[in-house]
């Protein structure tokens, strides 16, 4: 089931091509309860969650996926489970805001001239949940994304209209 939110896009000419951006929000897997916060590591269960979700992502996500992770150790470990190149962006740290996250990925256009872009963000609550709420409901709200889960959004501009669609929500306990 897909959920869609439509709104008017910035003025575009008839010659402007249709574009699409996929955004996957992946909350880091289960981590130790310790301090300092940036140094918290994944638990054994978290490592398993990260590996399972990484396999699902590799099977289902677009192939041109750009991966960006928070500098927190638990997010770095979650990203490494993919065994793919990724970058680190301090704007995605535990205290990130929704505007920080959206700026880091250049939502809804991506930082490319290609017609189709896909970005995977590995980050934290409450930022990921608040971002999901904004994309689907039009305003930030306190939505929760479960540890290790992925929420996949597609944003496209078609005939001058922007549409955001929720393509999938995948919690780690649903993958065996």
Language-model segments: residues:
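Short, surface-exposed amphipathic charged segments that create phosphate/polyanion-binding patches used
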Residues: 102-108, 160
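Short, low-complexity, intrinsically disordered N-terminal peptides in bacterial proteins
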Residues: 1-21, 112-115, 175-176
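Active-site-proximal alpha-helix that buttresses catalytic centers in soluble enzyme cores
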Residues: 6, 17-103, 141-142
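Generic beta-sheet signal
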Residues: 23, 65, 110-123
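Domain-level recognition of soluble alpha/beta enzyme cores
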Residues: 139-165, 171-175
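Histidine-centered catalytic micro-motifs
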Residues: 25-31, 121-128
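Non-DNA-binding regulatory cores of transcription-related proteins
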Residues: 112-113, 125-148, 163
């Amino acid at each position: 089931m897909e959920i869609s939110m439509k709104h008017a896009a910035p003025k575009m000419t008839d010659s402007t091509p249709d574009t699409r951006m996929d955004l996957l929000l992946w909350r880091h897997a289960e981590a130790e309860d310790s301090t300092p916060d940036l140094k918290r590591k994944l638990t054994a269960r978290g490592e398993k969650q990260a590996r399972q979700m990484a396999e699902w992502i590799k099977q289902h996500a677009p192939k041109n996926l750009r991966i960006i992770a928070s500098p927190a150790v638990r997010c770095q470990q979650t990203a490494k489970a993919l065994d793919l190149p990724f970058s680190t962006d301090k704007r995605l740290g535990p205290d990130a805001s929704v505007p920080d996250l959206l700026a880091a990925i250049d939502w809804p256009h991506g930082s490319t001239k290609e017609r189709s872009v896909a970005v995977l963000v590995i980050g934290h609550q409450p930022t990921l949940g608040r971002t999901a709420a904004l994309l689907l409901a039009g305003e930030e709200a306190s939505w929760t994304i479960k540890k290790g889960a992925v929420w996949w959004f597609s944003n496209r501009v078609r005939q001058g209209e922007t549409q955001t669609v929720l393509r999938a929500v995948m919690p780690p306990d649903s993958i065996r």
